[in-house]
Structure formats: C-alpha cells, structure tokens
C-alpha cells in the first residue's frame, strides 16, 4: 500500500487526549482556535491508541491519523498565584481560568492547582481525567479523577502543560517578587484572575509549548526596588525586639538646627553624629503622651539616638542584605516526581478547645501579671529603654479569673462532662438549664415558618432548621420541641420518617406549613403567595427498598399457543 508523503503528518510533540470526530450538532463540534480539521481517512491510516479518550457516543477505538493539529499555535498562559487555589475547568463562576464553556467533556471544575514558590500541587477532579506534561523531566502523567501530583520548580522555570481533552494550558510559576510585597501586584496578573472568560488577559505565547515563557525581569526588579527603598515600612530588630524607624524628615532636622542655635544641643555631639540613628520608645509611654517624661520630646529623641549609637545588631544587617539583593535559590530537582493519591491522604478533624485550655490560659495570664508587677517596680527604680513584648490579656467579661482552689472543681467538672458526653442529656435537664435563655414560642414559630416558606423544597427536613436553635442542642431535643409546637398549632405539620439512610444516619422528620388549616387570614395572605404547594403524596413518607426482581418461569411454545387459542 502506497501512502504519499503529503498525507503523512507528524504527531503532536505533546501526548494529548485527542477528541474523536465531531458528532452531528453535538457539543464536540467546537474546539479552541479551530485547530481540529477532519478529513476522510484513507485505508491504513489508523494509529493505535492504547488509552482512548472517554466519549459519550460510539466511535472507533483508534482516531484517524489525518486529524490535523497545530502544535506550534499560541497556547493560553496562566500565571499561578502563590498560596492561592487556582481552579481550571468549564464553569465561569467557579474557575479562575475557563477552558471551554461548550465542551461537556470538561467538568465544571476539572483541575485544582495550588502553587508555592518551589512546589506546584495539581489535583484532577474531572470525570474523564487529564494529562500533565512536565517537559523538564520529559515525563507525562496520565491522571484520573482524584489523582494528585507534586511538581518541583526547575532551575529554568520550565512550565508544565495541562491537557484536558485537547485543551492545553501553560501553567506559569509565580514570580519571586509576589511573596515580598503583595501590594504591588502585576496589573496583568490581577486582570487575568478577574476576567477568566475574556481572551485579552490570557497571554498568547508565540513559542513552542515546550519552551518556558518569557518573563519581564524589569518589572520584578522594580518591585524589589520599591519594597527595599520604601521609608514608611518599619523594620524589626530581632535581637532587641524593638521598632527601628528610618531617619527623620526635613522638619525634624530644621527643629534640631533651631535648637542648636539656642544652645540646647552641643555642636560636638552633632558633628559626631551627622547621620541620625534610629530612635527607640521609652519604657513609660503614658508619661510620653502626657508630656511629663520630658518636656522637650525632640531633644529626648536626639539624646536617645546618640546614646544608642551601636545598638544595631548583626541580624538587622543580614535582613537588610537579604531584602536588598534577594534572589531565588532553586531547590535541587529530584529524579522521580512525587505522586500522592487521595486514598493515602489522612483527614484529621480539627480539635476543639476545652476547659483544660482555658485553665492553662488562666495560669499563663496570672503568671504574666506577676511578672508585669515585678517589672513595673524595677522600672521605676532604673529607667530602661527597651520595650518588652506584652502578652495578650483576657478581659474579665469573657473569662472570670478564679483562685487556685477553684481549679480542682473545674477539673472535676471537666471529667464529669467527658463521661457524660457518651450519652445524650435528657430533655428535662436541658430545658431546665436553658429556660432563661430560651425564646418565646411565638417568636420561634415565626422564625420556623419563615424558613419553611422561603425554602427551596416543599418540605424542609429537620437538620435544615437546626440553626434556629442553640448549637449544642441535640437534634432529638429539637424534634421534640417542634412536635410540641405542632401540637399547639395545627397548621405546622410534620411528615414522619423512619429508618436510616444509606450512610446509616437516622431519617429525621420533614416539616411544612399548611395554609388550608390556618385560621389567621393575615398570615395566610402573607405566606401563601410565596410558598410552594405541598402535594398530598409528599405528606406521607414512602420508604423504598431495592428488591431483586423475580424471574418469571418461561413456558414452552405449545402451552402459550394453547392459551392464545383458548
């Protein structure tokens, strides 16, 4: 068989989940940039595909090799934001970057990308998977749903390519200046996340998909210069734990010159200290605000700055050198990529703070109060220029300070509560404890009716009404409370349900408002136009169980013929 060289086309440089031929007027008829042109395949022009793409219609297992592709066409480029969740898919409401709004082979949210300065975590949540190409290691990941991979940033910043059913996106690594100063964000990246549907924010790179994107290093250097030369940002001295401010403004220098002429400042001191050193706040800030510490605040700042001439530490110098000439030091690449499956991820519930945490916090605050009192007595004897960090204090309105004798009683109460958590409290005890804080029945009934009327369903289940009650109130007690209201008000009706659902959770009752039984005309006129009518079939719960169908005995043809004749 002779195949002309004109019909032989080179394959795509990147393995892709190529879509099949378009069905008539189906959602596969559109493709980005119209890069797919189909011709009638000749005999022997089929290419074997060991992993064919998912399709919703019948198609041959091997696509035609005559499918023309444009591997060198411009590809959409998305710059990832550091420490942000970037979503890619079909939905323009949920995703930061939209691949296609027509092709339903793409899920609403198909990929979730979380990126840092040196790592990129790509998770596939689409129904038919996707392909990630890491060109630095020349590896291709065929990801299925709920698969997750971790990519390490290479030295050349080569960007991975995300391929979802033929729609390719170049995932750019975050810029180095993004973590330093988030206020000076690039306007192009900001608009890119604001308008995921518009084609203008997406940078079209006239390069091969395997080559890294061109970066504007001048903009990154400008961001660094703006951050390091900003005079309004205070710098933290790690050793002395004090705030260090930049040199004073021209107004302060003019005041110093005026004081020098008056003779309040010696010329020898000013000649030695032509450049003012950072000033430090005194220990007693109340005297400073009232003006009793020193009548001349400017002179006090000058004296303190002259006395603390050599206070700058080596840690501050190191921090300044890092901020002025900060460069990214890439991490050595690993030979094999890190692959994480969802099954191996252990989900740990968040721990809630108990009474023991409150007791430890009280002990900590009491200890700090004693240390503060001792520090205040010593500070009155000898003035100290350093500012000590103050621990957060708990207000008396939130937590009452107790004596050490009361801690034993609190611990005993804590043990009793842990033992009693296994069994639900009785309704009588709970009602007695919350009688003072409980709302009147009329107000509670009005809130419940509002929830029922404005609900999206005709009948509302009990868990949807639990937010109207205290958070620590069990659902069983909420159901008893609602049944008490239903006994007093007949228009507040219940659909009783029994048994459990597929997860083994109990099926709670459903509630609805029946305006036909309500005698209050004003309430009926207010609620009837807004609510959805409840059919009679919905007012009785039907529990359905799956049962294996019974096989009917097949009769012979003679017997069936006899029945037809008879």
Curated annotation (Swiss-Prot):
Conditions for induction: Transcriptionally regulated in a cell cycle-dependent manner by the mlu1 cell-cycle box binding factor (MBF) complex independently of sep1 and ace2. Strongly up-regulated in cells arrested in S phase by hydroxyurea.
Source domain of life: Eukaryota
GO MF assignments: chromatin binding
Residue numbers carrying Phosphoserine: 73, 379, 382
Domain FHA: start-end pairs: 86-137
CDD domains according to UniProt: FHA_PLM2-like (cd22699)
Keywords recorded for this protein, A-Z: Nucleus, Phosphoprotein, Transcription, Transcription regulation
GO CC, one annotated term: nucleus
PROSITE patterns given in the database record: FHA_DOMAIN (PS50006)
InterPro entries with a match to the protein in the record: FHA_dom, SMAD_FHA_dom_sf
Compositional bias segments (type: Acidic residues): 314-330
Record function comment: Probable transcriptional regulatory protein Required for G1/S progression.
Name assigned to this protein: Transcription factor P14E8.02
